[in-house]
Curated annotation (Swiss-Prot):
Organism field: Schizosaccharomyces pombe (strain 972 / ATCC 24843)
SMART domains: RING (SM00184), ZnF_C3H1 (SM00356)
UniProt subunit comment: Belongs to the 40S cdc5-associated complex (or cwf complex), a spliceosome sub-complex reminiscent of a late-stage spliceosome composed of the U2, U5 and U6 snRNAs and at least brr2, cdc5, cwf2/prp3, cwf3/syf1, cwf4/syf3, cwf5/ecm2, spp42/cwf6, cwf7/spf27, cwf8, cwf9, cwf10, cwf11, cwf12, prp45/cwf13, cwf14, cwf15, cwf16, cwf17, cwf18, cwf19, cwf20, cwf21, cwf22, cwf23, cwf24, cwf25, cwf26, cyp7/cwf27, cwf28, cwf29/ist3, lea1, msl1, prp5/cwf1, prp10, prp12/sap130, prp17, prp22, sap61, sap62, sap114, sap145, slu7, smb1, smd1, smd3, smf1, smg1 and syf2.
Protein name: Pre-mRNA-splicing factor cwf24
Biological process per Gene Ontology, one example term: mRNA cis splicing, via spliceosome
Stated role: Involved in mRNA splicing.
Gene: cwf24
Amino acid sequence: MEQKNLNINQASGSKINTELAVPIFQSRRRHRPRQGLKRKKGFKRDDDSGGSSESSNEDMRDNIPIVSGRKKTVRLNRLQRESEQFENSALKDINVEYQSNLSATGESVNTTTVSAINEDTREVILGRPSPKLANQSTLPTELFQSQNDYSRFLPKRKDFEKKSQVGPVLSSNASTVRMNTIIDYQPDVCKDYKLTGYCGYGDTCKFLHMREDYKAGWQLDREWDSVQEKYKKGAKLEEGMVKNEKKEDIPFVCLICKKDYRSPIATTCGHHFCEQCAITRYRKTPTCIQCGADTKGLFSVDKNFDRLLKNRKSKNDEAVKQKVGGFESNNSATTEVSERKDREASFQGFADTLAKPNTSAQQKMPSLGDNSNTIISKYFIREITESNIVHFKRLVRVVLEASYSDKFYRLVLKNPDYARIATFEDKFVGAISSLVAEDNSLYVTVLCVLAPYRCLGIGSLLIDHVKKTAINNNIDRISLHVQTTNESVIKWYTAHGFKIVKQINDFYRRLENKSAFYMVCPLSAHNNIISNH
């Protein structure tokens, strides 16, 4: 209603009532205080007049306009924008091209018109270093020069060989670093350092750097054992007995001549022979007849050997006084040769009784571990096994002076029925081995007896065992080869039923006499005799 009245009054030209007017609020923009916009005092120059007062300076600062830090943006109208775009498009239409093959050199440049302030600028323009005059001297060292000129005065680092560097190499920056190295040395001496005095590992080598000689453990043990042998109970050697050598190991005759020792000598392997016999054998072969080792022609006189023979002879004389064959021998002066004849006679008497049927029980010696042992007094034969194959090899090498391959000894072990080894007082003195051929015959490959134990019936015992085994296996004959010059062996085989069939030349390739007799023994004629055995 009031608004309607107001409109009516205005239309009628009446005076407007101020009490009914609408209030209008307008926020006034606040300005920054003028005192905070005062400039700082500038740097006072010397030429400024000192009479000017501070009031005049303040009036001048008031007249300086204040520049705002905000960038003022100016808006362009349409005409200005079109003119600016036209100028930019005109610049784009203008295309400037150039081409150069860079073939110009410094010599083609006209040097007469080139002037430079210093030598460096001239070298850049001309493209070549400027020649120095002969009388031009270098600058004194007191003047300042460029860094390149000073670098040539620095001393060069001397070259060093890398081989001379041993051990851990530290960097130059680690001069203040302290290092403790602990090396666990092995109980061995460095071989390189001991021989040459130089080791590539240096201080890091785990072996000891010593050049002295030290005894190994086994050497110390050997010396200790040799000292302790003197204090062992019952270890005292007999007077005249060689150290570490039993009395039974020395044959009572020379193995080469089969006679008593004459001027006995000892070889490097510890065996004794006659001096003349050893020299004669060395001319043919350098091996020892007893062990097969190389003597190298070195023989020495054993001073205790004669005394040892006398001690053994005295003990044998005492043994002869005992009962032999039911009677006591009162001959105290019996020699070793007579003793051997007595043993041969006793063994021959036992062999004669063996040919006749005997109903009395035979007393046997205790066996040494083999099941099928033939016991005959002190002599008996065993099967060849892995435990005694070494003794079989030694007999073949010493008696026959032959060396067979391992394949041959494996064949001997595969045919245990036709291979035996004879022993005397636990010593291996003889052996025999045979192989079955394809024509149902038996071929004797080895038959050997040591020289001191021959003519005692050991060889006959071995060949009779092979014959008996062959007859039980229905084998017709036994064959073998004998050297034509070995008359005693040919006579022995003939006495045991062998006959010469033919002669073969060049049978033994490594012997001087290479011819051999091929001998055969038929088993049909020996059936009755062997069966009684």
